[in-house]
Amino acid sequence: MDHLPMPKFGPLAGLRVVFSGIEIAGPFAGQMFAEWGAEVIWIENVAWADTIRVQPNYPQLSRRNLHALSLNIFKDEGREAFLKLMETTDIFIEASKGPAFARRGITDEVLWQHNPKLVIAHLSGFGQYGTEEYTNLPAYNTIAQAFSGYLIQNGDVDQPMPAFPYTADYFSGLTATTAALAALHKVRETSKGESIDIAMYEVMLRMGQYFMMDYFNGGEMCPRMTKGKDPYYAGCGLYKCADGYIVMELVGITQIAECFKDIGLAHLLGTPEIPEGTQLIHRIECSYGPLVEEKLDAWLAAHTIAEVKERFAELNIACAKVLTVPELESNPQYVARESITQWQTMDGRTCKGPNVMPKFKNNPGQIWRGMPSHGMDTAAILKNIGYSENDIQELVSKGLAKVED
């Protein structure tokens, strides 16, 4: 297979990934492959571009490094072109409502007839099967969080609240990426393709597991946090200093002992409620939990963030300032690791945003291209799989493909 023009880089160089999906979850899966060196083809509807394009800046990050194909993959010759593309594809990711592709005739079995080694990742809100009530429903970030038990655990004691920005989309997209790579590893051993059913609510169920395990195995419901503080443990969570906010984790025998000296509670060490060797202070079960919070709040409020960070570094207590977005660029750790970078958009503008992550030492990822325009690479992709200029023009004339204007 001849690859589309692009630099060779990263741990996934030579891999062809195709995805069909809009907005965040499915495309995020594909875009991670693209930043790690895979050749990634983004399929868009012919008549309507991906709705993410209406956003002024985010698409320049979420669709960088991609090849844009505008094709009606469900109809006539457009379907034929799509299936021909699948013959040279390693991984196909689709994000839709339940078994939407199967309902329209593109089943796993049809895809495997064209490529027996194909890895297929289906990403949906409620999965490819289950009850009719749920399987075909649309789902976004908040839907998956609400249905999974994740949302009810977040927010304040007075009201649950979703975790933003779009947590379920990113967790689900990354799950699709890792699952597809796991499947590909097995396919290369067996030469037999794989189909993966990723339900967003199940991803969030797994991500929300920590406190739920106490309910499943004992009926204990975890309370939601109060003003950003850990629902169970004193000295853990969000706290206000004289000039802003920090997060901290008061964990460890020595850390608790030294911190208690600073906040005037050293006399509690070694009591039945806080015996020697205590590593965490339970804010509910320990009768002194509220007092610890009260004293810690007062001590922190009387000190600046810089003073707190300096003292906690001496005590080996984990803490960090809650950075504002404008503070990120100048933070020395961000600068040292080039966590924020710049790249050129297709129309020549400079775009700034997060760099490729994680950092591979021997085969690093890179940004080689901005977001392509709608249908920008349609002709090149179709030529790559054997279509002539006349074939492409015929698809365009029938409304089955769109090429760049």
UniProtKB/Swiss-Prot annotation:
Subunit organization: Homodimer.
SUPFAM superfamilies for the chain: CoA-transferase family III (CaiB/BaiF) (SSF89796)
Associated pathway: Amine and polyamine metabolism; carnitine metabolism
Gene Ontology CC: cytoplasm
Compartment(s) of residence: Cytoplasm
Catalytic activity: crotonobetainyl-CoA + (R)-carnitine = crotonobetaine + (R)-carnitinyl-CoA; 4-(trimethylamino)butanoyl-CoA + (R)-carnitine = (R)-carnitinyl-CoA + 4-(trimethylamino)butanoate
Residues involved in CoA binding: K97, R104
Keyword Cytoplasm: yes
One example of a Gene Ontology biological process annotation: carnitine metabolic process
Alphabetically ordered keywords of this record: Cytoplasm, Transferase
Species assigned in the record: Escherichia fergusonii (strain ATCC 35469 / DSM 13698 / CCUG 18766 / IAM 14443 / JCM 21226 / LMG 7866 / NBRC 102419 / NCTC 12128 / CDC 0568-73)
Enzyme Commission number(s) from the entry: 2.8.3.21
Function in brief: Catalyzes the reversible transfer of the CoA moiety from gamma-butyrobetainyl-CoA to L-carnitine to generate L-carnitinyl-CoA and gamma-butyrobetaine. Is also able to catalyze the reversible transfer of the CoA moiety from gamma-butyrobetainyl-CoA or L-carnitinyl-CoA to crotonobetaine to generate crotonobetainyl-CoA.
A UniProt-annotated Pfam family: CoA_transf_3
PANTHER family (alphabetical): L-CARNITINE COA-TRANSFERASE, SUCCINYL-COA--D-CITRAMALATE COA-TRANSFERASE
Domain of life: Bacteria
GO molecular function, one term: L-carnitine CoA-transferase activity
Protein name listed in UniProt: L-carnitine CoA-transferase
Family: Belongs to the CoA-transferase III family. CaiB subfamily.
Signal peptide: none
Residue positions of the active site: D169
InterPro entries linked: CoA-transferase_III, CoA-Trfase_CaiB, CoA-Trfase_fam_III, CoA-Trfase_III_dom3_sf, CoA-Trfase_III_dom_1_sf
